């Protein structure tokens, strides 16, 4: 088919009552879309949606009049709020597009819909980089959400480690390995593995 997708949490035809959400994190989909294909126009409401391009170009169009292409080094953040329709298509007729689609439960219903596309600040190896933060808490090159949720990326050299600290006491963190191996809080994770961590103020990540 035109779509190769892996779901961390229950979504569409995949349902596991033990894997509905992790805190406010509701969806984490790892999608590969064939050339010239994609998700036609469909509705959303009352959800915060983040797309992170990994490879290729994703063409976004929505009922607010936005039409943009998302490429590696960029993210798009959308608040569905009172309701929007949008489409996501592979912008290439020859190459696949790979991206992560992440849904976060909103802090309140019926926000005004909005869309932002952000060019991320250059990543520094072996340092955490915040790419999404709550409204008013991020910098120039970060997206924001209607939720107490933070997204960070990390590119670690083998043998290096960092300590991740929770931004809010009582929050948990979900770690997803895009490539390579990582040891997270003593557990070894491989490519595309994920793990939730909670009941702690922080934890170590080691390559």
Functional labels for PLM-detected ranges:
Residues 45-65, 72-75, 158-160, 164-187, ...:
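Glycine- and acidic-residue-biased ligand/ion/polar-headgroup-sensing regions
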Residues 37-44, 61-62, 87-91, 142-144, ...:
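Short histidine-centered beta-strand/loop micro-motifs
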Residues 130-139, 144, 183-184, 188-204:
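Short, polar/charged, low-complexity connector loops/linkers at domain or secondary-structure junctions
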Residues 63-67, 80-110, 190, 198-207:
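Ligand-binding loop in jelly-roll beta-barrel domains
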Residues 32-37, 54-66, 70-74, 79-92:
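Short acidic (Asp/Glu) patches
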């Amino acid at each position: 088919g035109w779509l190769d997708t892996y779901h961390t949490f229950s979504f569409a035809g995949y349902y596991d009552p033990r894997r509905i959400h992790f805190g406010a994190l509701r969806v984490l989909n790892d999608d590969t879309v064939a050339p010239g294909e994609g998700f036609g126009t469909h509705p959303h409401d009352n959800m915060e949606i983040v797309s992170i391009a990994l490879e290729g170009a994703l063409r976004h169009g929505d009922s607010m009049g936005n039409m943009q292409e998302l490429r590696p080094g960029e993210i798009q953040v959308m608040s569905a709020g009172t309701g929007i329709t949008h489409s996501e298509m592979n912008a290439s007729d020859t190459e696949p597009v790979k991206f992560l689609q992440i849904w976060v439960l909103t802090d309140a219903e019926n926000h005004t819909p909005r869309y932002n596309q952000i060019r991320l600040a250059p990543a520094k190896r072996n340092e955490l980089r915040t790419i999404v933060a709550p409204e008013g808490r991020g910098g120039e090159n970060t997206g924001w959400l209607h939720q107490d949720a933070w997204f960070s990326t990390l590119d670690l050299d083998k043998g290096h480690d960092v300590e991740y600290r929770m931004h809010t006491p009582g929050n948990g963190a979900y770690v997803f390995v895009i490539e390579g191996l990582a040891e997270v809080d003593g557990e070894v994770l491989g490519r595309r593995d994920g793990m939730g961590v909670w009941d702690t103020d922080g934890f170590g990540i080691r390559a």
